[in-house]
Amino acid sequence: FIAKWDTTQPGSANDTVVLPLVADGSYNFYIDWGDGNRDTITGYNQPEVTHQYSDTGIYTIRVVSNNMVGWQFDDSGDDDKLVEIMEWGPLRFVSDDTNLFKGCSNLTLSTTSNPPFNADAAGMFQDCSSLTGTGGDILNWDVGSVTGMDFMLAGCTSLDADLSNWDVSAVKSAEGFMSGAGLSTMNYDRVLSGWSSQSVQSGVN
């Protein structure tokens, strides 16, 4: 997992980054904080989950191991400090986590790999108002295993994308999926047309 963080954005102190790990996660990874320091993380609440820099600014943080399961901002913590995801890498999500990146208002995606979706992607990118249709290869995301999309892209005011290629055949609930998003009429029509041609679950909200 490689991402850029801006310590000066709202959240913890303006020289600090706090990882959004969760109590039911599983962790055993090295993290390179981008300033020459590394730590080993084995628990969600150990002191090293918080890192203080000597200078404020933008840092590229890298997870350099392969056991990092569990992540959730839920419109809190240092959500505004996460400004770019460059690689998803080993990051995985706990099965019942939702609202994973909710509230990350400055988040952009430069990675072209697929997010590590769970079955329930509810609120995953809700209120990520800097996401656009050109970043992260969002047009071609493989969501074929996702069953829940409630409010997944709601409030993404800069997102105007043709998502008609998404495989939504497994989706059972999509309440408020793109409520308040920046979808143009043209792309809205494309999405409706593309999805209507698929065999979808009955009774989808």
Cite the ranges covered by each PLM segment.
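Negatively charged
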Residues: 1-205
